[in-house]
């Protein structure tokens, strides 16, 4: 009995302390915060995130409380931006203020203590690695130089589809293999024996790192950090990742050059590592972190976008017919089409843009407001975690007619690009932290998609109709399909 009373006293004391701390923190906040839903003591608005994917739940909140909404998630104060206007102000007008990232357990473990580029803080290291990326690694010129790799891997994929003619094929799995092979050969100069294991690890990491860990939301609690089960799972994954990447890098050192005779991405990183004039020297972990960036941002996102594009075209047969007609007319007689050839495919570009609007590769873009500022009339305190809901902006009826409908033809009337200039459509982000690999990513989406539309017609398995297709998403940084895309390919006969 005494023990029970003691526990009650302890629990009451702890809760009282947490409530008082919560009120003390609230008293330090400015008065002109963005609108906010009613919150609970201690947990704040955490209970509102139940029952759906984060981008869906946050859209519901901003639809009710305004395009700029303030949330308290545990101890952490966050702001959600769900309009083109507020996002433009944060990512363009106030870009240096919002160019930072906030730390999380997932990024610190899997991305080498954020010693990469995607999750790096806004500092000299980030500026340096981004400059290398833009000028040396993923420039438009280098993207074109990887053309033969795309052609080679597309030929492999086409052979797989041909061998499955008339039978159901797991298109998601085969497209992911192709995307992984392209990135692996561009990074390491050759196909590597464990690249399949790395691809599986990327999927697992993206799924786990996309969640809201309690230890991240209560950073002052050593107990929650100690009890965080996912932290230990991520640490085991990090060990597997180290083994794979260390093996890749050792294998890379013994070969003389990439398969195209020049430098691959790892060659460039090693060369830069030896440069004694660099402000922030590149470490071995920095090289591994950047390689994991390339795989996580370049493999899964490209593959996911192709899968969503094919899914939407299968669900909208009239759009499929139009896309195939254009591809087959413009690419007729071209044996190995690449980036220059697909530039002529206006409708294909619209299909890709519409796919990225509905299924952005990064539904939520994280930023950190490093100093107090004002966005659309509201005060954003310093060190506020900021989430840009790209998924919600792409489905906002204020910018898009029939926003939930897949309609590539809308871009005949509305001229918007996907490279960060038009804030109604920012699948790759915008401002200083716009994705530096967007040209590489677009090439690895448009070229394979064009060839898949050129060479094959498609049916759904058994008695399934377009209306039966499951278009659900599953949790993950890249917004992947919940279920794999299963299709029946038929070789297109131009004379039939």
From Swiss-Prot:
Keyword terms of this UniProt record: Heme, Iron, Membrane, Metal-binding, Monooxygenase, Oxidoreductase, Signal-anchor, Transmembrane, Transmembrane helix
Induction conditions: Induced by drought. Accumulates upon root colonization by Myrmica ants (Myrmica sabuleti and Myrmica scabrinodis) concomitantly with jasmonates induction; this leads to the production of carvacrol, an attractant for the phytophagous-predaceous butterfly Maculinea arion, whose larvae initially feed on Origanum vulgare flowerheads before switching to parasitize Myrmica ant colonies for their main period of growth. Strongly induced by Spodoptera littoralis, a herbivory insect, thus triggering the production of carvacrol, which exhibits insecticide properties.
Enzyme class: oxidoreductase
Pathway: Secondary metabolite biosynthesis; terpenoid biosynthesis
CC cofactor: heme
Organism: Origanum vulgare
Gene3D superfamilies: Cytochrome P450
Transmembrane segments: 1-21
Role according to the record: Involved in the biosynthesis of phenolic monoterpenes natural products thymol and carvacrol which have a broad range of biological activities acting as antimicrobial compounds, insecticides, antioxidants and pharmaceutical agents. Catalyzes the C2-hydroxylation of gamma-terpinene to produce carvacrol. Also mediates the C6-hydroxylation of (4S)-limonene and (4R)-limonene to form carveol.
Pfam families the record matches: p450
Classification via SUPFAM superfamilies: Cytochrome P450 (SSF48264)
Enzyme Commission code: 1.14.14.-, 1.14.14.51, 1.14.14.53
Biotech / industrial applications: The monoterpenic phenol thymol is widely used as a fragrance and a flavoring ingredient in food and cosmetic industries. Its derivatives have also several biological and pharmacological properties such as antimicrobial, antioxidant, anticarcinogenesis, anti-inflammatory and antispasmodic activities. Medical applications include the treatment of disorders affecting the respiratory, nervous, and cardiovascular systems. It may also act as a growth enhancer and immunomodulator. The monoterpenic phenol carvacrol is commonly used as a fragrance and a food flavoring ingredient and preservative. Its derivatives exhibit also various biological and pharmacological properties including antioxidant, antibacterial, antifungal, insecticid, nematicid, anticancer, anti-inflammatory, hepatoprotective, spasmolytic, and vasorelaxant. Phytochemical inhibitor targeting the main SARS-CoV-2 viral protease (Mpro) and ACE2 in human host cells, carvacrol is a possible candidate for treating COVID-19.
Catalytic reaction(s) noted: gamma-terpinene + 2 reduced [NADPH--hemoprotein reductase] + 2 O2 = carvacrol + 2 oxidized [NADPH--hemoprotein reductase] + 3 H2O + 2 H(+); (4S)-limonene + reduced [NADPH--hemoprotein reductase] + O2 = (1S,5R)-carveol + oxidized [NADPH--hemoprotein reductase] + H2O + H(+); (4R)-limonene + reduced [NADPH--hemoprotein reductase] + O2 = (1R,5S)-carveol + oxidized [NADPH--hemoprotein reductase] + H2O + H(+)
Membrane topology, from the record: Single-pass type II membrane protein
Subcellular location, record wording: Membrane
Annotated region (Disordered), positions in chain: 471-496
GO molecular function: heme binding; iron ion binding; monooxygenase activity; oxidoreductase activity, acting on paired donors, with incorporation or reduction of molecular oxygen
Tissue expression pattern: Mostly expressed in flowers and stems, and, to a lower extent, in leaves.
Protein name (Swiss-Prot/TrEMBL): Cytochrome P450 71D180
Binding residues annotated for heme, in chain numbering: 435
GO cellular component: membrane
Family classification: Belongs to the cytochrome P450 family.
């Amino acid at each position: 009995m005494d023990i029970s009373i003691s526990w009650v006293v302890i629990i009451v004391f702890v809760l009282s302390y947490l409530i008082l701390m919560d009120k003390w923190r609230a008293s330090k906040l400015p008065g002109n915060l963005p609108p906010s839903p009613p919150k609970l003591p201690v947990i704040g608005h955490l209970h509102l995130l139940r029952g759906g994917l984060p981008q869906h739940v946050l859209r519901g909140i901003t639809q009710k409380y305004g395009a700029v909404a303030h949330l308290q998630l545990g101890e952490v104060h966050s702001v959600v931006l769900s309009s083109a206007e507020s996002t433009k102000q944060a990512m363009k007008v106030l870009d240096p203020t919002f160019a930072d990232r906030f730390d999380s357990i997932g990024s610190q473990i899997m991305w080498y203590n954020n010693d990469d580029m995607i999750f790096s803080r806004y500092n000299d290291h980030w500026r340096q690695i981004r400059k290398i990326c833009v000028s040396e690694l993923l420039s438009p010129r280098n993207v074109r130089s990887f053309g033969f790799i795309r052609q080679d891997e597309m030929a492999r994929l086409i052979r797989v589809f041909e061998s499955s003619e008339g039978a159901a094929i797991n298109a998601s799995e085969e497209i992911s293999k192709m995307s992984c092979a392209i990135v692996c050969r561009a990074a390491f100069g050759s196909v590597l024996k464990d690249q399949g294991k790395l691809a599986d690890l990327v999927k697992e990491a993206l799924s786990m790192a996309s969640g809201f860990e309690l230890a991240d939301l209560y950073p002052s609690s050593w107990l929650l950090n100690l009890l965080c089960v996912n932290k230990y799972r991520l640490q085991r994954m990090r060990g597997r990742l180290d083994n794979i990447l260390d093996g890749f890098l050792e294998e890379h050192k013994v070969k003389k050059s990439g398969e195209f005779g020049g430098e691959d991405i790892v060659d460039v990183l090693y060369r830069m590592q030896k440069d004694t004039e660099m402000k922030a020297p590149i470490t071995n972990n920095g090289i591994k972190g950047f390689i994991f960036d390339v795989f996580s941002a370049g493999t899964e996102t490209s593959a996911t976008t192709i899968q969503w594009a094919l899914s939407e075209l299968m669900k909208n047969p009239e759009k499929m017919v139009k896309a195939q007609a254009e591809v087959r007319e413009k690419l007729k007689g071209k044996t190995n089409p690449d980036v220059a050839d697909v530039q002529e495919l206006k409708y294909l570009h619209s299909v890709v843009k519409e796919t990225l609007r509905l299924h952005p590769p990064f539904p939520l873009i994280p930023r950190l407001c490093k100093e107090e500022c004002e966005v659309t009339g509201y005060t954003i305190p310093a060190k506020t975690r900021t989430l840009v809901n790209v998924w919600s902006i792409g489905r906002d009826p204020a910018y898009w007619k029939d926003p939930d409908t897949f309609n590539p033809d809308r871009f005949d009337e509305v001229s918007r690009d996907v490279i960060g200039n038009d804030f109604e459509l920012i699948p790759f982000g915008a401002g200083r932290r716009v994705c530096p690999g967007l040209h590489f990513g677009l090439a690895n989406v448009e070229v394979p998609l064009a060839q898949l539309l050129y060479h094959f017609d498609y049916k759904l398995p058994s008695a399934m109709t377009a209306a039966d297709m499951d278009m659900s998403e599953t949790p993950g940084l890249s917004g992947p399909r919940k279920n794999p895309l299963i299709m029946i390919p038929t070789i297109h006969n131009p004379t039939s």
